[in-house]
Structures are given as structure tokens and as C-alpha cells.
From Swiss-Prot:
ATP-binding is among the record's keywords: no
Organism name: Trichlorobacter lovleyi (strain ATCC BAA-1151 / DSM 17278 / SZ) (Geobacter lovleyi)
Cross-referenced InterPro entries: IGPD_sf, ImidazoleglycerolP_deHydtase, ImidazoleglycerP_deHydtase_CS, Ribosomal_Su5_D2-typ_SF
Annotated protein name in UniProt: Imidazoleglycerol-phosphate dehydratase
Family to which the UniProt record says this protein belongs: Belongs to the imidazoleglycerol-phosphate dehydratase family.
Enzyme nomenclature, EC number: 4.2.1.19
GO CC term, one of those recorded: cytoplasm
Pathway: Amino-acid biosynthesis; L-histidine biosynthesis; L-histidine from 5-phospho-alpha-D-ribose 1-diphosphate: step 6/9
Pfam families: IGPD (PF00475)
Leader sequence residues: none
Example GO molecular function: imidazoleglycerol-phosphate dehydratase activity
GO biological processes: L-histidine biosynthetic process
Catalysed conversion reaction: D-erythro-1-(imidazol-4-yl)glycerol 3-phosphate = 3-(imidazol-4-yl)-2-oxopropyl phosphate + H2O
Cellular compartment(s): Cytoplasm
Length: 195
């Protein structure tokens, strides 16, 4: 059974079409009108080996906030839908990613309980036109709508682009690990019998 989801979401602030294949090869087609986010989502898909299509339009004449947050919402919903009852998945994933002077650790638990820990102090507030604080908004929206614990910890780093990039690569790799299916599992990875 293919683990896929396709979602269309329209609000007064954004219009988003997203298609996800969990068991992909890292192919992506991303057009969000936020170039730095496009770059991060390409990296996420490639390093997580997810096939991902995102087309988004938003009120970027105001700022990027609504577009970035709403894409996090839709991506989280897509993972939740594609994983279904989560039978057979490993559930946990972690990745420690270097990017030159930066080292970031990302851990996920597909528990059904949304929670974000974001220990990422950024040395400046912008990467080009992108407000660096929006990375946190994206991850919070994802965790809330996927229903997962998501922990991002920056061990060290100086370049804000490298820091956010290491976080997105680690996000992809940790989700790849957590969504893997293990033939030894019957049901879900929980003594409760449900995730």
C-alpha cells in the first residue's frame, strides 16, 4: 500500500496544494513564492527521500509568516494522513547533521501527541528576505498537525543559513527513520496498541 497524501487548503491568506509520497526517492517540485523556504523544502525532501510537490500562494506583500506557517500545517496533515494507523512504523527517528561550522540534532516521535522543543538560538534575524524566526513557526505548525513530538537542538553554529539548513536536513532524515516500516512489528510501536 502506497503511503501518500494530497491536500488542497485555501484560506483568505494562502492557497496551498501539496502532494506527498513517504516511500519516495527524494524528488521534489516546490513553488511557494518564498525562495528560502523552497530551498529548505527541497533539502527536506531529498534528505528524507520523500517525493514532495508544493504549490503555494500567500499574502507575501504583508510578510512570509502566513505562507510559511500554513505550509507547515499542510505538510503535517499530509504526513498524518499518509501514515494512517501507523501500524508497522518504527515511530522514532533522530539525526545529527553537520553543516560546516554548525551541528544540529533533530529527533521525532510519531506518538500522536503534538509537542515542539526548539533550542535553536539564531545569531541574526534574517537570511536574505526570510525572517529566521519563521523556521520555528514552520516546525510548530508541522508538529501540531502531524501529531508528533519534534525536538530540534542546535549544538553549535554561527551562520544562520547553515543552522536552518542543518535543521531541515535533520528533519528529513529523522522523519525518514521514524516512518520506516519494520516487518517484525505487528500493530503499532506502543504498549497501548494505538498511536
Amino acid at each position: 500500500m502506497k503511503r501518500t497524501a494530497e491536500i488542497d487548503r485555501s484560506t483568505s491568506e494562502t492557497r496551498i496544494h501539496l502532494k506527498l509520497t513517504i516511500d519516495g526517492t527524494g524528488l521534489s517540485a516546490i513553488r511557494t513564492t518564498v525562495p528560502f523556504l523552497d530551498h529548505m523544502l527541497h533539502l527536506f525532501a531529498r534528505h528524507g527521500l520523500f517525493d514532495l510537490t508544493v504549490e503555494a500562494q500567500g499574502d507575501i506583500d504583508i510578510d512570509f509568516h502566513h505562507t510559511v506557517e500554513d505550509i507547515g500545517i499542510v505538510l503535517g496533515e499530509a504526513f498524518r494522513q499518509a501514515l494512517g494507523d501507523k501500524k508497522g512504523i518504527v515511530r522514532y527517528g533522530t539525526a545529527r547533521i553537520p553543516m560546516d561550522e554548525t551541528l544540529a540534532d533533530v529527533t521525532v516521535d510519531l506518538s500522536g501527541r503534538p509537542y515542539l522543543v526548539y533550542n535553536v538560538d539564531l545569531p541574526k534575524v534574517k537570511v536574505g528576505e526570510f525572517d529566521a524566526e519563521l523556521a520555528r513557526e514552520f516546525f510548530q505548525a508541522f508538529a501540531n498537525n502531524c501529531g508528533c513530538n519534534l525536538h530540534l537542538n542546535l549544538l553549535y553554529g554561527e551562520n544562520v543559513h547553515h543552522i536552518i539548513e542543518a535543521c531541515f536536513k535533520g528533519f528529513g532524515r529523522s522523519l525518514d527513520s521514524a516512518t520506516r516500516q519494520d516487518a517484525r512489528l505487528h500493530g503499532v510501536m506502543s504498549t497501548k496498541g494505538v498511536l
